[in-house]
Amino acid sequence: MSHYEGDLRTPESARFAILASRWNARITDTLVAGARQSLAGNGIAEANIDVIRVPGAWELPLVAARLAAAHEHAAILTLGCVIRGDTRHYEHVADRCAEGLMRVQLDFGVPVLNGVLAVERVEDAEARAGGSHGNKGEEVALAALEMVNLLEQLP
């Protein structure tokens, strides 16, 4: 019986893309900083990290698909923040973004990590962007490293 489990060891030559929405920039900038710090702390050179900004979470799947099709990145980290408002717009954006990112991952076989915060209040986002619930950008980066390692092991 074989057992496979990824760890944080990734080839030094591996490239990572961080896609981040500009919407709610105060939150997303903190997520990006956490992701970059986490990748660098695990041996990924700054030159191997591409940061791409998009207007909002809605645009993340399209850019992720373009990057995945180019096959230049070992993983694509997506970061954003959607905060519930008074309309149903929140559900449309958060749900369709997640569905689109999953489709890109499955269609191209490249890990696409969903670090888009879908929260009720700005305080919930702050708690997940370096506050009491940690930094989800850091967590997404660690998951990306682990997935790259795991996929290298699988037959």
Swiss-Prot record:
5-amino-6-(D-ribitylamino)uracil binds at residues 23, 57-59, 81-83, 114. Its EC number is 2.5.1.78. The keyword Ribonucleoprotein does not apply. It holds the Pfam family DMRL_synthase. The keyword Lyase does not apply. CDD domains: Lumazine_synthase-I. GO terms for cellular component: cytosol; riboflavin synthase complex. (2S)-2-hydroxy-3-oxobutyl phosphate binds at residues 86-87, 128. InterPro entries: LS (IPR034964), LS/RS (IPR002180), LS/RS_sf (IPR036467). GO terms for molecular function: 6,7-dimethyl-8-ribityllumazine synthase activity. The active site is at residue 89. GO terms for biological process: riboflavin biosynthetic process. Keywords: Riboflavin biosynthesis, Transferase. It comes from the Bacteria. It catalyses: (2S)-2-hydroxy-3-oxobutyl phosphate + 5-amino-6-(D-ribitylamino)uracil = 6,7-dimethyl-8-(1-D-ribityl)lumazine + phosphate + 2 H2O + H(+). Pathway: Cofactor biosynthesis; riboflavin biosynthesis; riboflavin from 2-hydroxy-3-oxobutyl phosphate and 5-amino-6-(D-ribitylamino)uracil: step 1/2. NCBIfam families: lumazine-synth. Belongs to the DMRL synthase family. Catalyzes the formation of 6,7-dimethyl-8-ribityllumazine by condensation of 5-amino-6-(D-ribitylamino)uracil with 3,4-dihydroxy-2-butanone 4-phosphate. This is the penultimate step in the biosynthesis of riboflavin. Forms an icosahedral capsid composed of 60 subunits, arranged as a dodecamer of pentamers. This is 6,7-dimethyl-8-ribityllumazine synthase. It comes from Stenotrophomonas maltophilia (strain K279a). The lineage of its organism: Bacteria, Pseudomonadati, Pseudomonadota, Gammaproteobacteria, Lysobacterales.
